[in-house]
Every structure is written in structure tokens, then in C-alpha cells.
Curated annotation (Swiss-Prot):
Signal peptide bounds: none
GO molecular function, one term: protein-macromolecule adaptor activity
SMART domains: WD40
Organism, scientific name: Homo sapiens
Biological process per Gene Ontology, one example term: cytoplasmic microtubule organization
UniProt effect for mutating R96K: In GAMOS1; does not affect interaction with INTS9 and INTS11
Consequence of changing W371G: In GAMOS1; unable to rescue a wdr73 knockdown in zebrafish; decreased interaction with INTS9 and INTS11
Primary localization class, coarse: cytoplasm
Xref: InterPro entries: WD40/YVTN_repeat-like_dom_sf (IPR015943), WD40_repeat_dom_sf (IPR036322), WD40_rpt (IPR001680), Wdr73 (IPR042795)
Protein name (Swiss-Prot/TrEMBL): Integrator complex assembly factor WDR73
């Protein structure tokens, strides 16, 4: 039997729900608006790129399966066009505003999702201090009463801008030229940064720049690029920061001690990430100690980190771990099992359905999948 046919048969056992869609263009953005819709945006250069607000199939908008539903496809609720490639998009909570970043990275763009039509239109821009041809500002949003946009391409250019007044309310005010890979707002006063080098920091915006940080991810990190995500912030002690290297190294850290990883493991990736800009690690919002990684090939790997505390082999090297689940649908459905297989550009967890993820690839496919934990007791 053809490998693709084998996978289709096996998928009946592997998935509770599975949907495959074709977008008009590849996306690096999957941004939730409530639990029923997502934004996607194209990132091709030298062309207009679509920004779309997609409504999920009705079956995925309910917490329990209650029979058959007629709608089995995404519906386009709103749309617009950007003259730039879009590498990041953030929805400003409790508003109809979006903030996008991409190349050329000389400014951020603010968009409004219309109430009385299906249009997403550009309404303003936010100036960027650091203007470099090859770098684009990372973006995060403080969802306070007066929303603030955190952005920067390097540590020295980090700042928070009030979205309404456009006044700068916080700056790093340092000369450090480290390149950023990700920014994440944790609460009304705190954000996390990850540098491409693996340097991590937690910043309190009520104080001058004095981050709680590590300076590097540890031995063996030369030449790697890194990304990170903080999960379950403020919910007690424990390893709530996951840091992923382009060679498949995955570190879990406790925010109270960023210099000493709680565990350091090696994920089974066949080759280093071909495009470290696409590296992604995410914590499952509805499953304890569960996370997913992508950006190495056409798969998304899901891990249970419950037993990883202190994980190292006797000679001090990192131990290899095996995923709890691997989504290979993009390879067999979109790539037909052929090389080069599609590359996953991003993934995200559904905010309410514990085992449901969305994933997209560079061939413009979008999958929604609810995986079955085959190791769980029946």
C-alpha cells in the first residue's frame, strides 16, 4: 500500500477530528480571536498579501461533539491586503484592531476589522527606531485599559508604545545589539524576551531596564538559533519556560533561575531547522506539562514533559526524548510523501479544546487536528 494510503488508514485511529484546507497563500500567522476564529496573513515579498479572518467549522466551535454539522470548512469573515510581507500579527484584545510586522521592517502597521462590512483596512502606522533591511520587529501587545504595543528587532530598540496616544511608555535604553527572536507579554507589567542566541530575560516595565536573565542557553549552543515561550505564568513554581534550539535541543527553565535549566533534552529531528525563523515551541493551554514544536520539517511534534525534571544522561549530555504524538499529515496529504516535503511555518493550540491544534506549511496548506493520546488509559 502507498505510504499516503497507509497514513490515511492510520489517521482514523490517530485523530478525533481532522480537517485540511488550502489557503490562497502560505502563512506564518495563526492568531486567535476568541475561540471561533483565526487570522492568517501572507508573507511573500514583492506582492500584495492577504490578511484573512477565518471562522472555524462549526464542529470545532463546540466543546463536545453533538452529532453531524453541515459546515465543514473555514468561512472568510473579513479580509484585506498588505503591500508588505507579514511575519507577525497580533490582535489587540477587546478591540477590533490588529498590529502587523514584516519586511521591509521600517514600521508597524495598525489595522481595523470593520463592524459593518467584511473589510480589514490599514488605519495607521507605528514608527520603528531600528530600520534594518533584513530584520523585522518582533511584536507583543499589553492588553490593559490603554493597550500598549511592545516591539523591537534588537534589545537596544525595545520599546512600548501606547496604541492610542502613540507615546513611548517604556524603552530598554541600552546599547545591546542582540537580535531578538520572540517577545511575549506575561501580565500588565511584565514581558519576556528571547534572543536568537538563546539569551532569555524577564522584564518588569515598572522599573528601569534590569531583566532577570541568562546570558546563553549553556554549553554546545554555538551557532544555534533559539525561540522560547512562557506557559502558566503566575501559577506557582516550576519549569514554565520552554526554549527550543535549531538543532532540536529543548530546555525547560524555572523563571526563578534562568541560568540553570531544570531539564535539557534532545528532540529527534533528522536535520537542523532549514529556516530557524520558523522555529516554534508552544505550551498546551489545556494540558499540564504538554508542549509542541515545529519548524524542522513537515511535522508537528507533541511532548509530555512530566518526567523530564533533571533529565540528563550520566555523562552530562542531554537525553533523547520521544514525542507523545507526531502530526505527519502535511507530508502525506500535501507533499504526497515526496521530497522536498512541505515545511511547517507555524502552529497553535486551540484555546478551549485541549488536544486540538492548527498548523500551516509553506505550500499554503492549513490543518486542524485533534489528536488521540494512545498512551492514555482506556
Amino acid at each position: 500500500m502507498d505510504p499516503g494510503d497507509d497514513w490515511l488508514v492510520e489517521s482514523l485511529r490517530l485523530y478525533q477530528d481532522f480537517y485540511a484546507f488550502d489557503l490562497s497563500g502560505a502563512t506564518r500567522v495563526l492568531e486567535w480571536i476568541d475561540d471561533k476564529g483565526v487570522f492568517v496573513a501572507g508573507y511573500e515579498s514583492l506582492k500584495k498579501n492577504e490578511i484573512l479572518h477565518l471562522k472555524l467549522p462549526l464542529r470545532l466551535s463546540v466543546k463536545e461533539n453533538k452529532g453531524l454539522f453541515p459546515e465543514r470548512d473555514f468561512k472568510v469573515r473579513h479580509g484585506g491586503f498588505s503591500d508588505r510581507s507579514i511575519f507577525d500579527l497580533k490582535h489587540v484584545p477587546h478591540t477590533r484592531l490588529l498590529v502587523t510586522s514584516g519586511l521591509p521592517g521600517c514600521y508597524l502597521q495598525v489595522w481595523q476589522v470593520a463592524e459593518d462590512s467584511d473589510v480589514i483596512k490599514a488605519v495607521s502606522t507605528i514608527a520603528v527606531h531600528e530600520k534594518e533591511e533584513s530584520l523585522w520587529p518582533r511584536v507583543a501587545v499589553f492588553s490593559t485599559l490603554a493597550p500598549g504595543v511592545l516591539h523591537g528587532a534588537r534589545l537596544r530598540s525595545l520599546q512600548v508604545v501606547d496604541l492610542e496616544s502613540r507615546k513611548t511608555t517604556y524603552t530598554s535604553d541600552v546599547s545591546d545589539s542582540e537580535e531578538l527572536s520572540s517577545l511575549q507579554v506575561l501580565d500588565a507589567d511584565t514581558f519576556a524576551f528571547c534572543c536568537a542566541s538563546g539569551r532569555l530575560g524577564l522584564v518588569d516595565t515598572r522599573q528601569k531596564w534590569a531583566p532577570l536573565e541568562n546570558r546563553s542557553p549553556g554549553p554546545g549552543s554555538g551557532g544555534e538559533r533559539w525561540c522560547a515561550e512562557v506557559g502558566s505564568w503566575g501559577q506557582g513554581p516550576g519549569p514554565s519556560i520552554a526554549s527550543l534550539g535549531s538543532d532540536g535541543r529543548l530546555c525547560l527553565l524555572d523563571p526563578r533561575d534562568l541560568c540553570h535549566p531544570v531539564s535539557s533534552v534532545q528532540c529527534p529531528v533528522s536535520v537542523p531547522s532549514p529556516d530557524p525563523e520558523l522555529l516554534r515551541v508552544t505550551w498546551a493551554p489545556g494540558l499540564k506539562n504538554c508542549l509542541a514544536i515545529s519548524g524542522f520539517d513537515g511535522t508537528v511534534q507533541v511532548y509530555d514533559a512530566t518526567s523530564w525534571d533533571g533529565t540528563r544522561s550520566q555523562d552530562g549530555t542531554r537525553s533523547q526524548v520521544e514525542p507523545l504524538f507526531t502530526h505527519r499529515g502535511h507530508i502525506f496529504l500535501d507533499g504526497n510523501g515526496m521530497d522536498p516535503a512541505p515545511l511547517v511555518t507555524t502552529h497553535t493550540w486551540h484555546p478551549c479544546r485541549p488536544r486540538t491544534l492548527l498548523s500551516a506549511t509553506n505550500d499554503a496548506s492549513l490543518h486542524v487536528w485533534d489528536w488521540v493520546d494512545l498512551c492514555a488509559p482506556r
